[in-house]
Amino acid sequence: MARGRKMCKPRAVEAAAAAVAATAPGPEMVEQRGPGRPRSDGENVFAGQSKIYAYMSPNKCSAMRSPLQEENSVAHHEVKCPGKPLAGIYRKREEKRNTGNVIRSAVKSDEQKSKDTRRGPLAPFPNQKSEAAEPPKTPPPSCDSTNVAVAKQALKKSLKGKQAPRKKSQGKTQQNRKLTDFYPVRRSSRKSKAELQSEERKKNELIESGKEEGMKIDLIDGKGRGVIATKQFSRGDFVVEYHGDLIEITDAKKREALYVQDPSTGCYMYYFQYLSKTYCVDATQETNRLGRLINHSKCGNCQTKLHDIDGVPHLILIASRDIAAGEELLYDYGDRSKASIEAYPWLKH
């Protein structure tokens, strides 16, 4: 069985290692500057030695370590800080933080004031924090006058930016107008049942009595006799009755054949349908009634209408529009046959 050899360090080597460890510099910072390399303004050069301690038992001394191990445990680190000194940088950072805090506190106080003014003198909610009661934070004494001026300018800009949309909204509210400013209010022109019944009674009285008021006979150029309004008629008003003999169609055809034989007689016959039957009002015979003398026009101011009284139809004329005094009364005869137009050319107009 072979025996192994144990290698031991000579005592001279251990002594040399102890001497090197004793003369090595400590962990404090030492400024190093090589020849020909002066320190520039604003540049801080530090050469620090960070000593790495090996995990050793407290019984072992530094003399037991080899010189190679001692050299490896020491490292030189050179730190360069170009630019301004560190103290100035730290001071500027603190000033920026202080100004930011001042701006935030001022903006918060203004927002709280605006909320309070909108809310009015109402009592605050129980869970709400009373931020408005707290006074605004004053800038710390470390801030100089320039920082305070910058904070005020920033606060003014923020307030202007918030007030601008309010002005726009106020302008919009001022421009809002009612719909009635552009369109008039439309009121119903319908008449009540009582009003309609009273009008029907008046028409019945006028028709049965035969009164014809508000008109007169006058000579019209190119037409002969005509009827002129002597008072104002409103739209829908009763004007006059087309009065004559009410006959059925069979009797009307016989009379019409007789009237054709005498050209000087003329034709004043008006045909209409009532309850699925055709009737005719013959006003050829000369009377003092004015309805038979109203002339024809396609753009007249009157129109015919049937009015029933006790089951008997009456042909009446009502105003199709407002009629002024002195205006001629006209209505459309409604005859478009070729024979009638050839006999009476004025029916075209």
From Swiss-Prot:
Residues 154-170 have a biased composition (Basic residues). GO terms for cellular component: chromosome; nucleus. It comes from Mus musculus. S-adenosyl-L-methionine binds at residues 223-225, 268, 295-296. It catalyses: L-lysyl(20)-[histone H4] + S-adenosyl-L-methionine = N(6)-methyl-L-lysyl(20)-[histone H4] + S-adenosyl-L-homocysteine + H(+); L-lysyl-[protein] + S-adenosyl-L-methionine = N(6)-methyl-L-lysyl-[protein] + S-adenosyl-L-homocysteine + H(+). The modification Phosphothreonine is found at residue 138. This is N-lysine methyltransferase KMT5A. Interacts with L3MBTL1. Interacts with SIRT2 (phosphorylated form); the interaction is direct, stimulates KMT5A-mediated methyltransferase activity at histone H4 'Lys-20' (H4K20me1) and is increased in a H(2)O(2)-induced oxidative stress-dependent manner. The lineage of its organism: Eukaryota, Metazoa, Chordata, Craniata, Vertebrata. Protein-lysine N-methyltransferase that monomethylates both histones and non-histone proteins. Specifically monomethylates 'Lys-20' of histone H4 (H4K20me1). H4K20me1 is enriched during mitosis and represents a specific tag for epigenetic transcriptional repression. Mainly functions in euchromatin regions, thereby playing a central role in the silencing of euchromatic genes. Required for cell proliferation, probably by contributing to the maintenance of proper higher-order structure of DNA during mitosis. Involved in chromosome condensation and proper cytokinesis. It is an enzyme of class 2 (transferase). Residues 107-119, 192-207 have a biased composition (Basic and acidic residues). GO terms for molecular function: histone H4K20 monomethyltransferase activity; histone methyltransferase activity; protein-lysine N-methyltransferase activity. GO terms for biological process: cell division; negative regulation of transcription by RNA polymerase II; peptidyl-lysine monomethylation; regulation of DNA damage response, signal transduction by p53 class mediator. The modification Phosphoserine is found at residue 57. The gene is Kmt5a.
